[in-house]
Amino acid sequence: MDSDDDNMEEVVEGPLDEDDQPHGFCTVTYSSSDRFEGHFVHGEKNGKGKFFFFDGSTLEGFYVDDALQGQGVYTYEDGGALHGFYVDGELNGPAQEFNSDGQLVFRGRYKDNIRYGMCWVYYPDGACVVGEVNEEGEMTGKAVAYVYPDGRTALYGSFVDGELIEARLATLTTQENGRPHFTVDPDSPIYCYDKSTSSCIAGHKLLPDPYESQRVYVGQSLISGAGEGLFAQTEAEANTVMAFYNGVRITHTEVDSRDWSMNGNTISLDEDTVIDVPAPFNMTENYCGSLGHKANHSFSPNCKYDQYVHPRFGQIKCIRTIRAVEKDEELTVAYGYDHEPSGKSGPEAPEWYTKQFLEFQQRESGKGADETC
């Protein structure tokens, strides 16, 4: 995060001293295409200055005797930023990192440019991993915890580079000076990394997720003909993760080539992968590791699908509220099928969806007519 300007040709714009060295506010462009703008004293950076690196990243702070000292901000080429404490040009001390959306993604310390001690790594979905990093700055050890978005429910145990190996259910009880304290349930089952494949939905199919189990349950849907549905076990505010959507991982081509009757529990994860909960795993007696596939469709949903990095299942999707929900309220999402056959704005709609959409339009038209009258 610094420019190695030794033995480099440079072009100086600004005042020079009697030895033709930068002296005062100058702009120095190096042969590497890196550029520095700031204050110099007889050829050495002294005072406020900023590096503009060839890859689009920048480094800004206060220089003393040619080295960055104290608070500095390194901005990545994608707009993310690292705010840290520098000693003689190297990160040594507390630091925070933010992604390009301004969300906190790291909180902890650095030593000689490497993450050090107790560190927190945050995911955009609201969860985090916390623990003492190893000598390489990796979240590896036997006393690391994954903390769910509620900030309390946790899996505490062994991780390698932030990935779950095995852990027990725990509760984050207190924090003191950035150091968490957990109470581990000695009777908890062991949770392990259990990412699905194209043929295996999970190794431990009947092991419920502890966070999800506190928030939802499956019951008879209030929607006519929908079968089972997903319900809130407790009140929840808007933007709350309620359930997870894990399944086997198949391709879009496979989904598109088969009959619609086989696609009742499919959801697109990304441009390459579709998550599917096929029979018999659509029944909770055969699979209950995640329950997100039980959420039914509504044109007036109270939830949405969102990306989620799960400690057991890896990159999946979750069910997240878009408004406050009451205890025992059915959780619904918009499936996002294409309403127009020629539109191709989303997956082609099955017959039941098209029928429900027409009925919804008729109801909305009726409401509009009543309001006009």
UniProtKB/Swiss-Prot annotation:
The record marks Y245, D256, T266, K317, Y335 as: Histone H3K4 binding. Gene3D superfamilies: Histone H3 K4-specific methyltransferase SET7/9 N-terminal domain, SET domain. Keywords: Activator, Chromatin regulator, Chromosome, Methyltransferase, Nucleus, Repeat, S-adenosyl-L-methionine, Transcription, Transcription regulation, Transferase. PROSITE patterns: SAM_MT43_SET7, SET. SUPFAM superfamilies: Histone H3 K4-specific methyltransferase SET7/9 N-terminal domain, SET domain. S-adenosyl-L-methionine binds at A226, G227, E228, N296, H297. It is found in: Nucleus; Chromosome. InterPro entries: Hist-Lys_N-MeTrfase_SETD7, MORN, SET_dom, SET_dom_sf, SETD7_N, SETD7_SET. Disulfide bonds: none annotated. MORN repeats lie at residues 36-58, 59-81, 106-128. GO terms for biological process: heart morphogenesis; heterochromatin organization; peptidyl-lysine dimethylation; peptidyl-lysine monomethylation; positive regulation of DNA-templated transcription. One of its GO terms (cellular component) is chromosome. One of its GO terms (molecular function) is histone H3K4 monomethyltransferase activity. It catalyses: L-lysyl(4)-[histone H3] + S-adenosyl-L-methionine = N(6)-methyl-L-lysyl(4)-[histone H3] + S-adenosyl-L-homocysteine + H(+); L-lysyl-[protein] + S-adenosyl-L-methionine = N(6)-methyl-L-lysyl-[protein] + S-adenosyl-L-homocysteine + H(+). Residues 214-336 form the SET domain. Its EC number is 2.1.1.364. Its main location: nucleus. Residues 1-20 are annotated as: Disordered. CDD domains: SET_SETD7. Belongs to the class V-like SAM-binding methyltransferase superfamily. Histone-lysine methyltransferase family. SET7 subfamily. Histone methyltransferase that specifically monomethylates 'Lys-4' of histone H3. H3 'Lys-4' methylation represents a specific tag for epigenetic transcriptional activation. Plays a central role in the transcriptional activation of genes. Also has methyltransferase activity toward non-histone proteins. The SET domain is necessary but not sufficient for histone methyltransferase activity. This is Histone-lysine N-methyltransferase SETD7. The gene is setd7.
